[in-house]
Amino acid sequence: MAFVPPQAGYDRAITVFSPDGRLFQVNYAREAVKRGATAVGVKCNEGVVLAVEKRITSRLIEPESYEKIFQIDDHIAAASSGIIADARVLVNRARLEAQIHRLTYGEPAPLAVIVKKICDLKQMHTQYGGVRPFGAALLMAGVNEKPELYETDPSGAYFAWKAVAIGSGRNTAMAIFEEKYKDDMSLEEAIKLAIFALAKTMEKPSAENIEVAIITVKDKKFRKLSREEIEKYLNEVMKEVEEEEVKEKEEDYSELDSHY
């Protein structure tokens, strides 16, 4: 008879807690997100920004076909990390809920309502047999009365953020946000911060493998930045990084001079 580890029963069944209160399949779904491409979101007074790493593994892939930021409604967008197919199901459900709300009430859906609907669906997939948790997390951004930014977890939990990152580069990006985020930053500064944080998590950042979208308070419309716009912001950000590195080196040398 083969040896069966003590936790195997809790490991296989989505509806059974382990003795220490964990649902292993939910934890594994989170691991799928941690291994996914990095996605970041930044909120400011003028709007909200989403930026995502596009992991293009072959030069034969058409970059435009590799979509990681999705329009949910005119005023709502989502960026994904984790299993893309799972994210697509969640995005389609969010689009459906947004249109149902618009047809029922004659007004754009509040972002918080859509986020709750999606997280209710995620939570259901942690509670019933015959299903598995969604191996994807979404950053959901939008503008109703004001800019809003939410992170949705595979467990069904959701949180509102000023700036947040998901995916493999989460720790690096969050450290940058903790240091550089300002409540009074402009939309352009928010775009630069999002691209800077994302670029720091990538080996070779370029306009081709970065996707950026914005929703402004002024028009409440979703818009993706063109490759030329992304390249302009990326060049400005990388130039600032190089200047900072040179300044740090000069400071280091000045400290050495004090020993003579």
UniProtKB/Swiss-Prot annotation:
Q: List the disulfide bonds.
A: none
Activity control: The formation of the proteasomal ATPase PAN-20S proteasome complex, via the docking of the C-termini of PAN into the intersubunit pockets in the alpha-rings, triggers opening of the gate for substrate entry. Interconversion between the open-gate and close-gate conformations leads to a dynamic regulation of the 20S proteasome proteolysis activity.
Which HAMAP family does the entry link to?
Answer: Proteasome_A_A (MF_00289_A)
Its recorded name reads Proteasome subunit alpha
The places in or outside the cell where this protein is found are: Cytoplasm
Subunit info here reads:
The 20S proteasome core is composed of 14 alpha and 14 beta subunits that assemble into four stacked heptameric rings, resulting in a barrel-shaped structure. The two inner rings, each composed of seven catalytic beta subunits, are sandwiched by two outer rings, each composed of seven alpha subunits. The catalytic chamber with the active sites is on the inside of the barrel. Has a gated structure, the ends of the cylinder being occluded by the N-termini of the alpha-subunits. Is capped at one or both ends by the proteasome regulatory ATPase, PAN.
* Function per UniProt: Component of the proteasome core, a large protease complex with broad specificity involved in protein degradation.
Stretches the record annotates as Disordered: 241-260
PROSITE patterns xrefs: PROTEASOME_ALPHA_1, PROTEASOME_ALPHA_2
Q: Which InterPro entries match?
A: Ntn_hydrolases_N (IPR029055), Proteasome_alpha (IPR050115), Proteasome_alpha-type (IPR023332), Proteasome_asu_arc (IPR019982), Proteasome_asu_N (IPR000426), Proteasome_sua/b (IPR001353)
UniProt keyword list: Cytoplasm, Proteasome
Q: Which Pfam families does this chain map to?
A: Proteasome, Proteasome_A_N
> Could you confirm whether the keyword Magnesium appears in this record?
no
Cite a single GO MF annotation: threonine-type endopeptidase activity
Q: Name one GO biological process term.
A: proteasomal protein catabolic process
Regarding protein family, the annotation reads: Belongs to the peptidase T1A family.
Provide a GO CC annotation, any one. proteasome core complex, alpha-subunit complex
